[in-house]
Amino acid sequence: MKRAVILSLGAALIVGLLPSGAVADHRPNSFCSQTGDFCQSTTRNSNRVRILQFRSFAHRGKVNVCVEAPTDTRTCVMDRFRDGNDDSVFVTRPKWKTEFPNEGPGAYTVVWRQNGGRTGKRLGFHR
């Protein structure tokens, strides 16, 4: 009996140390700065359309939005922060379907770059 318990504990320990196939490298799909100056998201709307959005009080001008696909290909588009509601919240929202290729199922990474450096966090989503 004692030997069976020891073997069971040993097997559980070994299984616990092995990486699980169900665990994947997930990036967050939204982020807001601690100061509240900006928020980013890579979510879907109610029509299941992918929305890549960056909203900010602080950022203006052009921004480069890059999506890295599961195939390791990267597509970048230049977009502009716009204040469409005249409320001093500037938004960039490039259209996923028309601006970025669908590279099939898997993890996608989204990065916003401005003035030569990354702006905000790396976000992600899965298809």
Could you describe each region identified by the protein language model?
Residues 50-53, 64-66, 76, 88, ...:
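Ordered hydrophobic segments in well-structured contexts
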Residues 86-101:
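Exposed aromatic-hydrophobic patches
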Residues 25-72:
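Short, surface-exposed binding/anchoring microloops in extracellular/periplasmic proteins
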Residues 44-46, 81-84, 125-127:
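A short, sequence-level motif marking secondary-structure junctions
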Residues 73-89:
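Solvent-exposed serine/threonine-rich low-complexity stretches and specific carbohydrate-binding patches
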Residues 1-42:
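N-terminal prepro-regions of secreted/extracellular proteins
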Residues 48-49, 95, 120:
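Intrinsic-disorder/low-complexity, polar/charged segments enriched in Ser/Thr/Lys/Arg/Asp/Glu/Gln
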Residues 55-57, 99-126:
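Short, exposed beta-strand-loop hairpins at the edges of beta-sheets
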